[in-house]
Amino acid sequence: MIDSTTLSKLALESGAIRFNPDKPFIWASGYKMPIYNDNRLLLGKPEYRTFVAQLFKRLLENLTQNIDVIAGTATAGIPHATTLADILKKPLIYVRASAKSHGMGNQIEGPLAPGQNVLLIEDLISTGGSAINAVNAIRKEGGIVNFCFCIFSYGFTETYKKFEEINCQYHSLLSFQTLL
């Protein structure tokens, strides 16, 4: 069982979740919403980072698939993936939104061998675009991604459908519905 009540309190205390129904926030997607989520603020205290990673670990224990590698989405998913990878003693990779235009031109940084089972960590899922992009990038390099975990999700029906279409489940520690 995930302790969403405690996580809700930590998110509100840290300012990671803010409400303003009178003056909605404008998201990058253009949506106007009465809530704003910035999970990077959960990074400010080691006990918050560890708590989030322990919740991810509990979610992972319920899966039937062994995980070889932990992946974080750039940039906000990386620190949470790092904390989880450290706890689990697993290799870590991270996935950029797009390949670099210089150097090796990598979209994925870190060791990934074809056939490895990868757990993707994202801080926030709204429309799912960045996480799905990361799943596709990992699969293109031969990684197997069947699961994506996030700290917070808005629980949009369309987002669940998009993840179903690519045969990847996503699970959130905290959802908009839980907060209400």
Give each language-model segment a name:
Residues 1-63:
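Active-site-facing substrate-recognition patch
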Residues 2-13, 136-180:
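PRPP-dependent phosphoribosyltransferase catalytic core
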Residues 56-68, 135-141:
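Phosphate/pyrophosphate-binding loops at sites that engage ATP/ADP/AMP, CoA/4′-phosphopantetheine
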Residues 68, 116, 146:
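Conserved acidic residues
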Residues 30, 70, 92:
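Conserved hydrophobic/aromatic pocket- or pore-lining residues that grip, position, or stack substrates
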Residues 65-74, 149-150:
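Short glycine-rich phosphate-binding loop at a beta-alpha junction
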Residues 81-119, 127-133:
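Short, glycine/charge-rich flexible loops or terminal/linker lids adjacent to PRPP-binding catalytic cores
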